[in-house]
Amino acid sequence: MRSLLLGTLCLLAVALAAEVKKPVEAAAPGTAEKLSSKATTLAERSTGLAFSLYQAMAKDQAVENILLSPLVVASSLGLVSLGGKATTASQAKAVLSAEKLRDEEVHTGLGELVRSLSNSTARNVTWKLGSRLYGPSSVSFADDFVRSSKQHYNCEHSKINFRDKRSALQSINEWASQTTDGKLPEVTKDVERTDGALLVNAMFFKPHWDEKFHHKMVDNRGFMVTRSYTVGVTMMHRTGLYNYYDDEKEKLQLVEMPLAHKLSSLIILMPHHVEPLERLEKLLTKEQLKTWMGKMQKKAVAISLPKGVVEVTHDLQKHLAGLGLTEAIDKNKADLSRMSGKKDLYLASVFHATAFEWDTEGNPFDQDIYGREELRSPKLFYADHPFIFLVRDNQSGSLLFIGRLVRPKGDKMRDEL
């Protein structure tokens, strides 16, 4: 079947090349903002945090799909350190491995980093991002904290009354929907602890490819969640030249797909065959990723990816606690007195909610490429089973996103033998 798919993709590629009548030049690459030394340092720290947090979440049996923005998580830690005192503040910096940086360096550096890497215009991606800190109706946020958190982290603030829980949840979800232009209609159906502060990050991210998928190269296929469970999904296909590596020893493939303006790339790691991702996740470290990427070579690759929107909400509270953020979430120990002027507040939840859209859009493809000899026998990267993916900034090496797709939206198709 895969041989047939490969032949079909090659024929479609040639046919589509002939269909394009007028050559269209790709958009000029964007210009990356030069980061300061403190922002560069925090980019490195946030990447380390990305792998630590991902590994912690991957071990949670209750978690299927994972979708994290390490930049946004780092900003959440910065916000806690801004509003905290003593050990509560120092723990937040320690989780970010920023203990040796002055507070002002952390806040200005993180602010600069997020503004630069989430600049949708410069990067030609769609990234809608909002952060809001909800406090109990009995608590008032201090003016200095409101001003500083808005300046550095673009964080909004609001009181919320959970006496009417249904109305409170509706308010949170409506804000998230408005922030993402309706792409993320719901953050959560429930809040367990309602006597503390809720930090909510709501995001919508849509990569625009350096070379788009053609809209005709889309069809319905099966995605094997496990060997015995398959769901129906829409798949998109294209053949092009990509950085690619096949680790035959570890039985996995990597492909790097540049995004429009080539300031960032999407990297996908996938086992050769359907299997739980636990084996790959044990291999995945910052250093191992660097090693794999160093072995990549430009090759012709026929890529098939699921098409659609993946919506994921994580309450990061317990996972951050596992990395060392224990005081801020403890009602009896938290000192967030810079937030409210009193030691009367703790962090009850850290909601990290994202809608990530896999779509065909991007720069016009170069139709001349399909006449080249090197595209005659492409490698096949058929993502019809669970995989890990990362969106990486090519200048700083910082990760905009890290995640895994285990169960896309779709109805059960059949049981496999």
Swiss-Prot record:
Record: glycosylation sites? 119, 124, 394
Q: Which residues carry this modification: N6-acetyllysine?
A: 206, 318
Q: Which Pfam families match?
A: Serpin
- Name the source's superkingdom: Eukaryota
- Designated name of the protein: Serpin H1
Q: Which residues carry this modification: N6-succinyllysine?
A: 93, 295
Site Reactive bond homolog: list residues: 376-377
**Triggers of expression:** By heat shock and retinoic acid.
Q: What does this protein do?
A: Binds specifically to collagen. Could be involved as a chaperone in the biosynthetic pathway of collagen.
Q: Does the keyword Isomerase apply?
A: no
Residues bearing Phosphoserine are 140
Instruction: Write the record's keywords in alphabetical order, separated by commas.
Output: Acetylation, Chaperone, Endoplasmic reticulum, Glycoprotein, Phosphoprotein, Signal, Stress response
What PANTHER family does the record tag this protein with? SERINE PROTEASE INHIBITOR, SERPIN (PTHR11461), SERPIN H1 (PTHR11461:SF27)
Which PROSITE patterns would you find in this protein's record? ER_TARGET, SERPIN
Species of origin reads Rattus norvegicus (Rat)
Q: Which stretch is the leader sequence?
A: 1-17
One GO cellular component this record assigns the protein to is: membrane raft
Give the record's family classification.
Belongs to the serpin family.
Q: Name one GO biological process term.
A: chondrocyte development involved in endochondral bone morphogenesis
Chain ranges for the short sequence motif Prevents secretion from ER as given in the UniProt record: 414-417
Is Signal among the key words of this record?
Answer: yes
